[in-house]
């Protein structure tokens, strides 16, 4: 329960930057968020591509995306060892509104410090 609450607070704390598609039929033409077309053009193939991310579980897809390193750290236990959602995210079908690294950069440094120590967020 603490892990779920931490993820909810974490995701709500930042602006939606890039939606990670988890459908095998995902295509760059289906992207709707600001910056998504530029991301798809910059990552046309491989594990960080829209197609590549659509073929793997959510936590794996996020870890393959170079714009989601802070989110990946937050949900994998690297930011706060008491919060590890990898198994949960990888064993279900989820839509994740994934704040990008620039979104996390807009948070006060004290918030990131609190996320590192307070698993109830």
From Swiss-Prot:
PROSITE patterns: FAS1 (PS50213). InterPro entries: FAS1_dom_sf, FAS1_domain. Residues 1-28 form the signal peptide. Residues 55-121 form the FAS1 domain. Keywords: Secreted, Signal. GO terms for cellular component: extracellular region. It is found in: Secreted. Transmembrane segments: none annotated. It comes from the Bacteria. The keyword Secreted applies. This is Immunogenic protein MPT70 analog. It comes from Mycobacterium kansasii. The lineage of its organism: Bacteria, Bacillati, Actinomycetota, Actinomycetes, Mycobacteriales.
């Amino acid at each position: 329960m603490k892990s779920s609450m931490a993820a909810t607070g974490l995701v709500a704390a930042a602006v939606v930057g890039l939606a990670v598609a988890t459908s095998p039929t995902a295509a760059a033409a289906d992207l709707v968020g600001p910056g998504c077309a530029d991301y798809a053009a910059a990552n046309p193939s491989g594990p960080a591509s829209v197609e590549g991310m659509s073929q793997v579980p959510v936590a794996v897809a996020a870890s393959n995306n170079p714009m989601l390193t802070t989110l990946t750290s937050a949900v994998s236990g690297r930011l706060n060892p008491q919060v590890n959602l990898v198994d949960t995210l990888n064993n279900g079908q989820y839509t994740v509104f994934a704040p990008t690294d620039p979104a996390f950069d807009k948070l006060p440094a004290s918030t990131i410090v609190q996320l590192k120590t307070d698993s109830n967020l």
